[in-house]
Amino acid sequence: MQVVSRRLVQRPLVGGASIYSSSSLRSLYGVSNHLNGTDNCRYSSSLATKGVGHLARKGTGGRSSVSGIVATVFGATGFLGRYLVQQLAKMGSQVLVPFRGSEDSPRHLKLMGDLGQVVPMKFDPRDEDSIKAVMAKANVVINLIGREYETRNFSFEDANHHIAEKLALVAKEHGGIMRYIQVSCLGASVSSPSRMLRAKAAAEEAVLNALPEATIMRPATMIGTEDRILNPWSMFVKKYGFLPLIGGGTTKFQPVYVVDVAAAIVAALKDDGSSMGKTYELGGPDVFTTHELAEIMYDMIREWPRYVKLPFPIAKAMAAPRDFMVNKVPFPLPSPQIFNLDQINALTTDTLVSDNALKFQDLDLVPHKLKGYPVEFLIQYRKGGPNFGSTVSEKIPTDFYP
């Protein structure tokens, strides 16, 4: 048997050209060419650190192609994360997935790319060295980390502000990060009645102070298979037979399909750098009141609409005990579903896209209407199966069940 060995040699750049000359990505900072070359693999932001040559854009655009993007996606195991990882992997990007929980938490993401394309990496968001390790080989960083409620270990400020600030500072020190995207929330403001939205606003300011050319995405309430609005509503209705309308159901907002938000993030990476340093407000095409969105939910799960109008003071009183006890008991409390005090505070004001804000259209995208496919996942709550339900006129046949 003849053994053939091959030595992989990194070829120097010709004429001092940047390794990203064929890519639409542009560096956030003026990094000299020698930092992007083979002299210093720490800043090469490519697979050259493993001796397999520089990443180059090639292929037809599928997941077996190479897009030139090596993205570290913080918060990839969450709701939006799975859709973003899927779209990045689909276009041939390598995706590094930091996670801090069980090793099973990112397992479903590995199926979204070719072998070795989606790489889970254990990390600690409070450990700077851990953050540097998961960011070391990336040229794109996307931060999706956020939390709608407090826990014993992470306050609103920890999850939504301090971690985002630390990630931005590490990315700045890295020197080879070409695009940085911070995912915030529509309605983020220092004057918001919601602590989470105030923390998100502080995070935006901290990120832009560290990386002035970072892109800020402000999605509205996201709708999708794993969402945290229509699913809890449906489960509450199936369990108790009615839905509480907090504040009478008159609050206006613009829910958006989660796949559209992921597409907007990818579109910002694909552009010529025109999205750098800008803030986008990503709301759906239609404005709903809480009551109108609940009607869509009832229609989809085929149940008779039954409501109990709950004034804000009563709703806050019902939600307050968890917030009071969260740091006073020696065990974790259940996650709040409908009665989340901070979300109730947020519902006291309308959350709509500003008239002069950059929107989906500025990224050449048209968001889906929240009818049909985007809410089709709710058929799982229909009584008797997907073809039945309480509002269906024909009765379920007696021989339907075995």
Curated annotation (Swiss-Prot):
<protein>
    <recommendedName>
        <fullName>NADH dehydrogenase [ubiquinone] 1 alpha subcomplex subunit 9, mitochondrial</fullName>
    </recommendedName>
</protein>
<feature type="transit peptide" description="Mitochondrion">
    <location>
        <begin position="1"/>
        <end position="43"/>
    </location>
</feature>
<keyword id="KW-0813">Transport</keyword>
<keyword id="KW-0809">Transit peptide</keyword>
<comment type="function">
    <text>Accessory subunit of the mitochondrial membrane respiratory chain NADH dehydrogenase (Complex I), that is believed not to be involved in catalysis. Complex I functions in the transfer of electrons from NADH to the respiratory chain. The immediate electron acceptor for the enzyme is believed to be ubiquinone.</text>
</comment>
<comment type="subunit">
    <text>Complex I is composed of at least 49 different subunits. This a component of the hydrophobic protein fraction.</text>
</comment>
<dbReference type="GO" id="GO:0005739">
    <property type="term" value="C:mitochondrion"/>
</dbReference>
<comment type="similarity">
    <text>Belongs to the complex I NDUFA9 subunit family.</text>
</comment>
<dbReference type="InterPro" id="IPR001509">
    <property type="entry name" value="Epimerase_deHydtase"/>
</dbReference>
<dbReference type="GO" id="GO:0005759">
    <property type="term" value="C:mitochondrial matrix"/>
</dbReference>
<keyword id="KW-0679">Respiratory chain</keyword>
<keyword id="KW-0285">Flavoprotein</keyword>
<keyword id="KW-0274">FAD</keyword>
<dbReference type="InterPro" id="IPR036291">
    <property type="entry name" value="NAD(P)-bd_dom_sf"/>
</dbReference>
<keyword id="KW-0249">Electron transport</keyword>
<dbReference type="Pfam" id="PF01370">
    <property type="entry name" value="Epimerase"/>
</dbReference>
<keyword id="KW-0496">Mitochondrion</keyword>
<dbReference type="InterPro" id="IPR051207">
    <property type="entry name" value="ComplexI_NDUFA9_subunit"/>
</dbReference>
